[in-house]
Amino acid sequence: MLNKDNYILNSLSDLDLSPTMEKNARDKYIALCKYLSEKGLDSDFQPQGSFLIGTTIKPYRDGKNQDYDLDVLAILKRNKDETNAERVKNDVGDLIKESGIYSDKLKKEDSNCWTLEYAEVSNGIGFSLDVVPAVDEIDDIKNVIILSGVDISKVKKTVAITEKKGYL
């Protein structure tokens, strides 16, 4: 019975993002944030989705393990009223494209993010970072959200992300 339990526990632990892989991914987006800052684009990066809440699982498609798909927000430090989605997205993308380090990792452009693909990190598995450019949401919108009953601590973290129509 112990062997079956160990097998199940090992199988489950293989599904999760390992601490080594998580640290590697965090190091990568911190380095990208630093690069953007050095190029004059002041931003903060933070994990998003399953990467944020620690529920990332290894993808499995067509009978094969796939690379992890991790999402991070690139929150530009600028007023939403003074920019637009196209500019926010392209300011990040243009710097990625001109970098010798990041341009080689850039996959095809998505409508609201830039995807950087990293080679094998551990046991034949790598990951990609979906970098989602965003700006802080304006106070008027935040106030409407608060009035709808959402907890203020959550509203303070509200950002506006780029989307297909080119509006924030």
Where are these regions (language model features)?
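Glycine- and aspartate-rich repeat motifs characteristic of hemolysin/RTX-like Ca2+-binding segments
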Residues: 71
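Nucleotidyltransferase catalytic cores
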Residues: 1-16, 20, 143-144, 151-168
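Short, flexible loop/turn elements at secondary-structure junctions
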Residues: 49-52, 74-80, 118-122, 133-135
